[in-house]
Regions:
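Bacterial N-terminal signal peptides that target proteins for export
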Residues: 1-9
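A bilobed periplasmic-binding-protein/Venus flytrap-type ligand-binding module shared by bacterial periplasmic
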Residues: 121-130, 245-262, 279
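Sec/Tat signal peptide C-region and signal peptidase I cleavage site
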Residues: 19-23
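Ligand-binding pocket segment of bilobal, Venus flytrap-like solute-binding proteins
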Residues: 172-239
């Protein structure tokens, strides 16, 4: 065998083995809150394509876990091996840092906008034609109105609902005592407290319970789009709502153990560059 041929074969073998060494298999777990299923199904497919442009030999599988934000945070504290968390409230991730000790206390400083790649707000979803005439928060405590909202103990969306209701009560009543009185009366109109926002949507949309659903804006629009929802429901934007800022974070110790730190960081950074915003969003000046 000529020296040129031996050199060529050696170079080819070196390239093959080098390629094998570089190519990796990744399995990433994103632990998220309830109504982000569809968002991350779309985003995960987009991210895999993005990653493979620079890492063509890699195999990437992204798993999703969804539920009430508080409940999901508790699961991570108790050992669910999330590489990233994309939860409804910063407080839920703070608890993971404090009790789980799997990421630093200053996690919000690592990504832009306090690690908040997207925002939302709270709106009302009512039956078609709005038969109960629900226009604002004050209408929710009318005698014959039944309100569907998740449990604030387990759901991040429910806590945003609570804060928006409190803000209305404070503005309308002029004192914290009046705000507390309003919120207490509001929850007397809630027949069932599901553990998460998607569960409450099912209760309202599929099971037909309640006159109004307090919903994430994206969840309300999804209800209109699915199964002829536009013929069954209307969205009401109250006079005052809240600017909800769901944060994201890499769970350092979990990602490190699985060799996923680089891809987990890229997963969240890329989230900022490819999100699409709807022109139907509520005006920010109507939020508090």
């Amino acid at each position: 065998m000529s020296s040129i041929r031996r050199y060529a074969l050696a170079a080819l073998a070196s390239a093959v083995f080098a390629g094998s060494a570089v190519a990796k298999d990744y399995e990433l777990l994103n632990v998220s809150y309830d109504p982000t299923r569809e968002l991350y199904q779309d985003y995960n497919a987009e991210f895999v394509n993005f990653w493979k442009k620079d890492h063509p030999g890699d195999n990437v599988k992204i798993q999703q876990s969804h539920g009430g934000s508080g409940k999901q945070g508790r699961a991570v504290i108790d050992g669910l091996r999330a590489d990233v968390v994309t939860l409804a409230l910063a407080g839920d991730i703070d608890e993971i840092a404090k009790l789980g000790k799997t990421l630093p206390a200053d996690w919000q400083k690592r990504l832009p906008d306090a690690s908040t790649p997207y925002t939302s707000t709270i709106v009302f979803l009512v039956r078609k034609g709005n038969p109960k005439g629900i226009k604002d928060w004050g209408d929710l405590i009318k005698k014959d109105v039944s309100v569907i909202t998740p449990n604030p103990k387990t759901s991040g969306g429910a806590r945003w609902n609570f804060l928006a209701a409190w803000a209305y009560g404070l503005k309308a009543g002029g004192s914290e005592a009046k705000a507390q009185e309003y919120v207490k009366e509001l929850f007397k109109h809630v027949p069932v407290l599901d553990t998460g926002a998607r569960g409450s949507t099912i209760t309202f949309v599929n099971n037909g319970q309640g006159d109004v659903l307090l919903a994430w804006e994206n969840e309300a629009f999804l209800a209109l789009k699915e199964d002829g929802g536009a013929d069954k429901f209307d969205i009401v934007v109250p006079s005052l709502s809240i600017l909800a800022e769901p944060p994201v974070a890499v769970v350092d110790k979990n990602a490190e153990k699985k060799g996923n730190t680089q891809i987990a960081e890229a997963y969240l950074k890329h989230l900022y560059s490819c999100l699409l915003y709807t022109s139907d969003a509520a005006d920010e000046e109507d939020s508090v």
